[in-house]
C-alpha cells in the first residue's frame, strides 16, 4: 500500500502504540525515518530501534518505546510540515516546545537534528515534528 506521508505514518504508529501501552511498534524502513529515530533515541524518547531486511528486498524498523514508572515518555508527538503544506523556519524562528521541555525535529542542510542542535549550528530548515 502506498503512503503519501511516510514520516506522518510512522509518527501515527508511535502515537497509537503509546496510547495502547505497547512496548514495540514496527514501521517500513526509510533513511528519513531512521534519522528521526536517531534523534528520538539520542534525546531519550525511545529506548532503541532495529532495522531488519526481508528476502523480498523490503526493510522494516522495529521501535522499542520507553516508559517511566508505567507512564509513556512521549506524551504528544505531532507532524508539523506535511506534504501539502511544508513549514520552513530560520534559526531565529525555531519554536520552543512546551517552554523548552519538548523538542522539535528539523531537516537541515547539515542533516536531521533536534532544535537545540540547529540553534547551536546556526542553521534552519524544514520543521518536521514536535515531541513532548
Curated annotation (Swiss-Prot):
Highest taxon above the source species:
Bacteria
Family note: Belongs to the universal ribosomal protein uS8 family.
Could you provide one GO biological process annotation from this protein's UniProt record? Answer: translation
Subunit comment for this entry?
Answer: Part of the 30S ribosomal subunit. Contacts proteins S5 and S12.
PROSITE patterns registered for this protein in UniProt: RIBOSOMAL_S8
SUPFAM superfamilies associated with the record: Ribosomal protein S8 (SSF56047)
Q: Can you cite an annotated GO cellular component? A: ribosome
The free-text function statement in the UniProt record for this protein reads: One of the primary rRNA binding proteins, it binds directly to 16S rRNA central domain where it helps coordinate assembly of the platform of the 30S subunit.
Q: Which named protein is this? A: Small ribosomal subunit protein uS8
Which UniProt keywords are listed?
Ribonucleoprotein, Ribosomal protein, RNA-binding, rRNA-binding
For this UniProt entry, the molecular function terms from Gene Ontology, in alphabetical order, are: rRNA binding; structural constituent of ribosome
Q: Which cysteines are joined by disulfide bonds?
A: none
Amino acid at each position: 500500500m502506498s503512503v503519501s506521508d511516510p514520516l506522518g505514518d510512522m509518527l501515527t504508529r508511535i502515537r497509537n502504540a503509546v496510547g495502547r501501552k505497547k512496548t514495540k511498534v514496527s514501521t517500513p524502513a526509510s533513511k528519513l525515518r531512521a534519522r528521526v529515530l536517531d534523534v528520538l533515541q539520542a534525546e531519550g524518547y525511545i529506548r532503541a530501534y532495529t532495522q531488519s531486511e526481508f528476502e523480498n528486498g523490503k526493510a522494516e524498523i522495529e521501535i522499542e518505546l520507553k516508559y517511566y514508572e508505567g507512564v509513556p515518555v512521549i506524551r504528544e508527538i505531532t507532524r508539523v510540515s506535511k506534504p501539502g503544506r511544508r513549514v520552513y523556519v530560520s534559526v531565529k524562528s525555531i519554536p520552543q516546545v512546551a517552554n523548552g521541555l519538548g523538542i522539535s525535529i528539523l531537516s537541515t542542510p547539515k542533516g536531521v537534528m533536534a532544535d537545540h542542535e540547529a540553534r547551536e549550528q546556526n542553521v534552519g530548515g524544514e520543521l518536521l515534528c514536535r515531541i513532548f
